C-alpha cells in the first residue's frame, strides 16, 4: 500500500473516531436522561456525597456488593466543584470515563504491537448492544473495570519485555502492584475479571511451552499482582466489612450444574455482541442489526481460529491475550454454572469487551489489504449503527420525574421517601434538590421505619426527613399498599398512569397517614 494512500486511510479512520465521539457527546447532551435508571443515578448521587464529604471512599454510604475504591466517583466527584448542573456533570464525567478507558486500551495496544487504533476506538464508542449502551456508553458504570483490566495486562506485557532493574520500570511495577491492591480492595469482581484468569493463562503457557523459562518472569509478575489483589481483598473482607456497609459475598453458594444457566450465559454473550432476538427476521432491525452482530461474531471467530492455526506467525504476547480472553470466558462460565450468584447479562461485559484487542490482533497478522478492507467495513457499520441509534425516535421514560421535581420544588418539599427504583433517579433529575430516603414494601406496608441500607447515606437510617415531606410511588406499588386504598385523596399532589405523588406538612403527618387503618 502506498504511503500517501496509507496516510489518507489513517486520516479517514481518525475522522471516523472524532465523528463517533461527537455523535455520542450530542446524544448524551440531549437524551442521556432517557437511558437512566435507579442504579446509574445512584452512582452520581454517591459521587455528589463523595464531593460533600471530601473523602473518595466515605464510611457514611451504604454500598452494594462492591466497595467503590477505584471507581467512577474519582472522575465525577471533582466535577461537582466545577459544575453546578447535574446533567452536565453526567455528560462530561461519562465522556471522561470513556476517554480514560480508550486511553487504557491505547497502552495495551502499544504493548501488544497492534495497529488500527482509531478503528478500535470507534468500536468502543459504538452502541453495540443494549447492555453496552446502558452500563458503558451512558452510565460509565463498567468503565473502571475495563480500564483496570487493560492497564493491568498492558503493564504485564510491558514489564515482561523490559528490565525491572531500571528505575522507571520499578515505578511501573509499583504502579501495577498498587493498582492490583486497589482493585482487590473493592471486592471479588476484579479478581474474577482480571487477575485469576491471567494467572491461569500464564501458568498454562509456562507449563506447555518448550522454552518455559521465558515465561517465568511473567508468572512472577502475575503472581505478584494476584497476591496484591488478594491482600486487598483480604483487607476488604476482614477490615472494610467492619467499617463500611457492604453486602457480603458469603451469601453465594455452590450448586449443581445447570443447562439452563449455561444457555443463559451463552445468550447473554450473544446479546452483549448485539444479537437481537424477538424481532422480525426481515425487518430493518432483524436484518441490519443482526448483520452487524454477524460481522462482529464471525470476525472474533476468525481471530481465534487464525491464532490457533498460525501460532508461530503471532507474537507470543498476542497469543497470550487470545488465550487470556478464552480463560476469562471460562472462569465466568464456571462461576455462573456452579454457583447461585445473581446473574444479569451485563455482568459479562468486562469479558465481552476484550473482543476489541482480539480483533486488532487478527488485523495485525493477516493479509494487510484484506484486513484494511475489513477494518473499513467494521468502521462503516459502527458509524451507521451509531447514527441510527442516536437519531431514532426517542421516548423519554423518565420525563415525568422532571414534572414531579418541579411540583416538589414549587411546594418547597426537598426530603422524603420512595422505593429504590425512584429515589436516586429523582435526586439526579431534580439536579440534586430532592434528597430521597428509599425503603421497602413488605406485605402491604410502606416501611419508612426500616430504611434499606443500599446505595444511600447511612444517616437516612438515623434521622427522618425535615420540613414538608412527600411519598413517590409507582402505580404498581400503590396497588400493593394498604394506605393507598383510603378514600381520602387530599394528600395527592400529582397522579398519572405511572405515578402517584403524596404531599404532607411534615414527617409526623406522613407517618400518621400511612399507619391509619382503612376507612
Question: Where are the model-predicted features located?
Answer:
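Signature aromatic-anchored transmembrane alpha helix within multi-pass, membrane-resident enzymes
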Residues: 3-19, 168-178, 223-227, 292-295, ...
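Hydrophobic/aromatic-rich transmembrane helices and adjacent perimembrane loops
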Residues: 141-148, 192-193, 287-298, 319-367
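Transmembrane-helix motifs of polytopic, lipid-linked glycan transferases
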Residues: 7, 19, 92-116, 151-155, ...
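Short periplasmic/luminal acceptor-recognition loop of GT-C membrane glycosyltransferases, typified by
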Residues: 66, 410-447
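Membrane-interface alpha helices of multi-pass inner-membrane proteins
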Residues: 170-189, 197-199
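Luminal/periplasmic acceptor-recognition loop/helix of membrane-associated glycosyltransferases
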Residues: 433-519
Amino acid at each position: 500500500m502506498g504511503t500517501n494512500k496509507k496516510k489518507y486511510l489513517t486520516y479517514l479512520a481518525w475522522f471516523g473516531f472524532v465523528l463517533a465521539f461527537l455523535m455520542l457527546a450530542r446524544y448524551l447532551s440531549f437524551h442521556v436522561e432517557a437511558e437512566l435508571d435507579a442504579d446509574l443515578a445512584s452512582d452520581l448521587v454517591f459521587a455528589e456525597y463523595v464531593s460533600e464529604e471530601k473523602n473518595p471512599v466515605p464510611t457514611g454510604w451504604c454500598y452494594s456488593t462492591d466497595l467503590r475504591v477505584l471507581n467512577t466517583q474519582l472522575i465525577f466527584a471533582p466535577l461537582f466543584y466545577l459544575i453546578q448542573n447535574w446533567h452536565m456533570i453526567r455528560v462530561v464525567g461519562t465522556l471522561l470515563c470513556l476517554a480514560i478507558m480508550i486511553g487504557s486500551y491505547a497502552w495495551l495496544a502499544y504493548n501488544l504491537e497492534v495497529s488500527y487504533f482509531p478503528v478500535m476506538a470507534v468500536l468502543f464508542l459504538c452502541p453495540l448492544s443494549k447492555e453496552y449502551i446502558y452500563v458503558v456508553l451512558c452510565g460509565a458504570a463498567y468503565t473502571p473495570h475495563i480500564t483496570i483490566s487493560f492497564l493491568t495486562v498492558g503493564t504485564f506485557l510491558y514489564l515482561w519485555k523490559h528490565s525491572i532493574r531500571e528505575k522507571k520500570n520499578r515505578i511501573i511495577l509499583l504502579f501495577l502492584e498498587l493498582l492490583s491492591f486497589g482493585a482487590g480492595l473493592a471486592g471479588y469482581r476484579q479478581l474474577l475479571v482480571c487477575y485469576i484468569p491471567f494467572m491461569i493463562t500464564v501458568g498454562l503457557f509456562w507449563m506447555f511451552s518448550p522454552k518455559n523459562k521465558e515465561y517465568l518472569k511473567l508468572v512472577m509478575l502475575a503472581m505478584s499482582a494476584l497476591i496484591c489483589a488478594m491482600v486487598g481483598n483480604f483487607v476488604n473482607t476482614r477490615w472494610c466489612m467492619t467499617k463500611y456497609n457492604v453486602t457480603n459475598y458469603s451469601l453465594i453458594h455452590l450448586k449443581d450444574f445447570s443447562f439452563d444457566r449455561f444457555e443463559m450465559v451463552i445468550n447473554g454473550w450473544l446479546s452483549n455482541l448485539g444479537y437481537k432476538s424477538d424481532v422480525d427476521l426481515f425487518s430493518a432491525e432483524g436484518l441490519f442489526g443482526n448483520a452487524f452482530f454477524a460481522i462482529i461474531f464471525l470476525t472474533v471467530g476468525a481471530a481465534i481460529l487464525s491464532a490457533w492455526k498460525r501460532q508461530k506467525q503471532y507474537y507470543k504476547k498476542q497469543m497470550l491475550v487470545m488465550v487470556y480472553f478464552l480463560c476469562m470466558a471460562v472462569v465466568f462460565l464456571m462461576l455462573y454454572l456452579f454457583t447461585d450468584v445473581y446473574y444479569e447479562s451485563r455482568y459479562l461485559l468486562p469479558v465481552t469487551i476484550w473482543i476489541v484487542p482480539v480483533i486488532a490482533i487478527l488485523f495485525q497478522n493477516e493479509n494487510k489489504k484484506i484486513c484494511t478492507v475489513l477494518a473499513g467495513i467494521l468502521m462503516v457499520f459502527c458509524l451507521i449503527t451509531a447514527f441510527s441509534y442516536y437519531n431514532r425516535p426517542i421516548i423519554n421514560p423518565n420525563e415525568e420525574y422532571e414534572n414531579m421535581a418541579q411540583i416538589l420544588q414549587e411546594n418547597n418539599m426537598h426530603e422524603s421517601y420512595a422505593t429504590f427504583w425512584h429515589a436516586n433517579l429523582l435526586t439526579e433529575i431534580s439536579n440534586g434538590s430532592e434528597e430521597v430516603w428509599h425503603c421497602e414494601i413488605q406485605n402491604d406496608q410502606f416501611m419508612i421505619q426500616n430504611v434499606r441500607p443500599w446505595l444511600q447515606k447511612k444517616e437516612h437510617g438515623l434521622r427522618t426527613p425535615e420540613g414538608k415531606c412527600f411519598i413517590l410511588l409507582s402505580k404498581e406499588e400503590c396497588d400493593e399498599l394498604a394506605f393507598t386504598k383510603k378514600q381520602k385523596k387530599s394528600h395527592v399532589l400529582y397522579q398519572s398512569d405511572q405515578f402517584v405523588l403524596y404531599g404532607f406538612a411534615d414527617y409526623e403527618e406522613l407517618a400518621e397517614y400511612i399507619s391509619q387503618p382503612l376507612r
